[in-house]
Amino acid sequence: MLLLLSVTPGLAANNMASERLKGYNYGYIYGVGNTLCGLVIDKLVKKKYAKDLLSGTVKALSESPDHKPYISEIRNAYENITEDIVCKEVYQ
């Protein structure tokens, strides 16, 4: 029983770190997509460049073994930013 209690805080810390990394990966892709969207709207970069850079970033992260636990968050962020009311036109 004592051993189980001593392991529990470690498990909680691992779960918290995992949740933070999920949020980080979601925010990273959504943030990159949003930034590129704004640059296209402001006519600072071409649509094709933004689309290619965002999809390439998502592909690279999705293929990385280190990011395997976060593929769902990466894909959700990509879907959400490409369907965003403002950015939809940029990524279609």
Q: Positions of the model-derived regions?
A:
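Short N-proximal segments of mature Sec-exported proteins
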Residues: 13-63
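Compact alpha-helical subdomains of small soluble proteins
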Residues: 44-92
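Structured catalytic/translocation cores of nucleotide/phosphate-coupled proteins
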Residues: 12-15, 70-72
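Generic detection of intrinsically disordered/low-complexity segments and helix-coil linkers/edges
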Residues: 5, 18, 22-24, 64, ...
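Sec-dependent signal peptide recognition
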Residues: 1-2
